[in-house]
Amino acid sequence: MGANIRYSNDYALSLASKNGHIKVVKYLVSKDANVTHDNNYAVRYASENGHFEVVKYLVDQGADIRDCRDYAVRFASENGHLEVVKYLVDKGANIRALDDYAVCLASVNGYIEIVKYLVSQGANFRADNDYAVRFASENGYLEVVKFLVDQGADIRADDDYAIISASVYGHLEVIKFLMSQGADFRSKNNASIKLAIKYKHPEIIEYFLTQCTDVNTDIINIFYAYLTKLASKNKTAKLVEYMNIFCHIINKYDNCVKHLMP
């Protein structure tokens, strides 16, 4: 008695497709495996994982690329599989499904060529309160950020989320670009400054110091407040670490900040 290739809802075909084993996929289909089983699982996950030849074959065999709200093109975009994305679009995939998920997640993950392609095909890069530029900034993808801004993205959306999150994760070049485009690092009660201090990004703190005189006072005061908080909680190791950062900045910017020390 032969093996049941359709066992557990065509699980064999699902795994072969997901992992890109085109010869196995073709064999299973020749033995009557169902390419549309489980909401077209096979083509969805072959697309997500960038297995172009598998995707094409499954589509030729009748797989529905638009199942589960265009899962295939959304996750191919999120994972950077440009060839698969273009093929799916040619076959009628909706790149704007689920509130322009495709361009948003391609931006978040820094896949600039996919972002450019999706925008050229009509994707709304400003969907969900400029999600794309906000999270491309958070993840430090400067090229994507620049492209989106050139296309008209609002870098100040959601109370300057872009520059605030870039400050958390230490993306100095993104911060410089955002500020050149009008981002306000003083928004939300100096959130960018506070977070750059909290997450120990001295190069960003130093950059903020160069921007205007009154910022110096704010940075010194915020630094002292943070040091006081650490001292009150007996966090000696952290206190020493932050004191070292603080002293480095004081020494480097002696002329502009030393006179501000209480």
Curated annotation (Swiss-Prot):
Pfam families: Ank (PF00023), Ank_2 (PF12796). ANK repeats lie at residues 8-37, 38-67, 68-97, 99-127, 128-157, 159-187, 189-217. InterPro entries: Ankyrin_rpt, Ankyrin_rpt-contain_sf. It comes from the Viruses. Signal peptide: none annotated. Keywords: ANK repeat, Repeat. SUPFAM superfamilies: Ankyrin repeat. This is Putative ankyrin repeat protein R848. It comes from Acanthamoeba polyphaga mimivirus (APMV).
